[in-house]
From Swiss-Prot:
UniProt family annotation: Belongs to the HAD-like hydrolase superfamily. YjjG family.
Free-text cofactor note: Strict requirement of divalent metal cation. The highest activity is observed with combination of Mg(2+) and Mn(2+), followed by Mg(2+) > Mn(2+) > Co(2+). No activity detected with Ca(2+), Cu(2+) or Zn(2+).
Enzyme class, spelled out: hydrolase
Keywords: Cytoplasm, Hydrolase, Magnesium, Manganese, Metal-binding, Nucleotide-binding
Catalytic center residues: D9 (nucleophile), D11 (proton donor)
Protein name as it appears in the record: Pyrimidine 5'-nucleotidase PynA
EC number(s) recorded for this UniProt protein: 3.1.3.5
One GO term (biological process): pyrimidine ribonucleotide catabolic process
Lineage: Bacteria, Bacillati, Bacillota, Bacilli, Lactobacillales
Gene3D superfamilies per record: HAD superfamily/HAD-like, Putative phosphatase, domain 2
Localization: Cytoplasm
Gene name tied to this protein: pynA
Length: 237
């Protein structure tokens, strides 16, 4: 299969969300006078991941996630806080974090040289993702950035990809590849939309989901090799 349009997930695929989250949380917790910051982080991080999974499964709304995660955090430690206000402060700090994964810029440079059209396709809050992208220096690589909040739908919904396709000139599913680390969002989303996928799996995780990636890679070099192999097969054919 010869691909032209590459849709990239951002967090944990190109952007270092863990580093960004750690800095933003530290700033927020210091602002709130928290003494044992690590204890709060240890509770918040898995709780937040679980809430995002619930959002993917449509068990909760985005508004509920955003407005309650910090009130839940502080409630766990016996404090009553305005979750909505804390969410605004956290988003302010997080939007300033543009840490990228090692090699991300080189990867995108290589793909541009190979004449691919690159697009960002991310679940998230517009103000945060646009801010982080601006800080990261990745914006010039992308023809367009698609954010779930703006599209009013999110991965893994097929509608997310349908709306993206409507905005890309010459778009065809057969020439499109979704690249990301999340089986339940990126890969399942590609499956739902009828789009081929690359599961970026640098930690060699096992797949215990129903999502079926077209390809699986463990590094950026693997990703390039996978795409180069497809080009060679196309030329040979």
């Amino acid at each position: 299969m010869f691909y032209k349009f590459l849709l990239f997930d951002l967090d944990h695929t190109l952007l270092d969300f863990d580093a960004a989250e750690d800095v933003a949380l530290t700033q927020l917790l210091k602002e709130e006078g928290v003494a044992d910051i690590q204890a709060y982080k240890d509770y918040y991080v898995p709780m937040n991941k679980a809430l995002w999974k619930d959002l993917e499964l449509k068990k909760i709304s985005k508004q509920e996630l955003v407005n309650t995660r910090f009130s839940r955090l502080f409630s766990h430690f016996g404090q009553e806080k305005d979750g909505s206000f804390l969410a605004q402060r956290y988003q302010f700090y997080l939007a300033q974090q543009g840490q990228t994964l090692s090699g991300a810029h080189d990867l995108l440079d290589s793909l541009i040289e190979r004449d691919y059209d690159l697009y960002a396709a991310t679940n998230g809050i517009t103000a945060i993702q646009t801010g982080r992208l601006a800080q990261s220096g990745l914006v010039p690589y992308f023809n367009q950035v698609f954010i779930s909040e703006q599209l009013q739908t999110q991965k893994p919904d097929a509608l997310f990809y349908e709306k993206i396709g409507q905005q890309i000139a010459g778009f065809s599913k057969e020439k499109t590849l979704m690249i990301g680390d999340s089986l339940t969002a990126d890969i399942q989303g590609g499956n739902n939309a009828g789009i081929d996928t690359i599961w970026y799996n640098p930690h060699h995780l096992e797949n215990h989901t129903q999502a079926q990636p077209t390809y699986e890679v463990y590094s950026y070099q693997d990703l390039l090799d996978c795409l180069d192999k497809n080009i060679l097969e196309k030329i040979t054919f």
